[in-house]
A protein has these predicted regions:
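Nucleic-acid endo/exonuclease domains
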Residues: 1-112
Length: 112
């Protein structure tokens, strides 16, 4: 499966937290975001080309040692390409959705 095909599958099988961010924030946000966007060998949850911002909705699997190391390597690659990477846990998205959206909005406004 190519990265593009995998991204398409991920879009069709989004987590509840990804769907919440997409349908309740990004879809109507005035600056365009894409979801499950391939960048190099990686697929990022949300991507804004204009602001060079990536937003990740991190589920429980991101807290195992191997995934922590993978995320660090991926973030370093993305940062080397000029992207700012924002990570939010599913719990943050559930319990502080307004705060998460505010952080994203500020980051976009600072970047464009």
């Amino acid at each position: 499966m190519t990265t593009t095909e995998k991204a398409k599958t991920l879009r069709k099988n989004a987590t509840p937290w990804e769907n919440k961010l997409w349908y309740e924030f990004f879809k109507s946000y005035p600056v365009k975001f894409r979801r499950q966007q391939p960048i190099g060998q990686y697929i990022v949850d949300f991507y804004c080309s204009k602001a060079k911002i990536i937003v990740e909705a991190d589920g429980g699997g991101h807290f195992y040692d191997d995934k922590i190391e993978y995320d660090k390597e991926r973030d370093l690659f993305l940062q080397s390409k000029g992207y700012k990477v924002l990570h939010f846990t599913n719990l943050e998205i559930d319990k502080n959705f307004y705060g998460v959206c505010t952080v994203i909005d500020r980051a976009v406004k600072e970047s464009i």
